[in-house]
Amino acid sequence: MADCIFCKIIAGEIPSSKVYEDEKVLAFLDISQVTPGHTLVVPKEHFRNVLDMDADSTSQLFARVPDIARKVMKATGAAGMNIINNNEEIAGQTVFHTHVHLAPRYSCLLYTSDAADE
């Protein structure tokens, strides 16, 4: 899709910090880091979101997510990982090319409601 920023990243027209790449997916650091190491995993074929994907394409994407998430956790020293997929604007999707967010979580960034009140 000509005006899709993720398609342009996949085509090499826009630079990215690649984390993983194979024939089906590309994973790269999100330009708007929620936490250090925040990575996006995108299929190389353009789909608006998961709701538009066929079963095989969905399987190809999600089969790679755990391995990429483990590699990001190892590289960043994260204690955990949020794995998130938003579908449509009402659900928080802002780029309309299917993508999965890998947001590493760190114990040093934890706080409780008690700590927030101080």
Regions found by a protein language model. Give the residues of each.
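Short acidic/His/Gly/Ser-rich catalytic and metal-binding motifs that mark active-site loops
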Residues: G37, L109-L110
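A short, flexible beta-alpha/helix-coil linker loop
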Residues: H46-N49, L109
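Conserved small/polar residues in nucleotide/adenosyl-binding loops
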Residues: Y111-A116
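Active-site microenvironments that recognize anionic phosphate/pyrophosphate groups
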Residues: M1-E45
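Histidine-centered catalytic micro-motifs
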Residues: K44, N87-I90, V95-R105
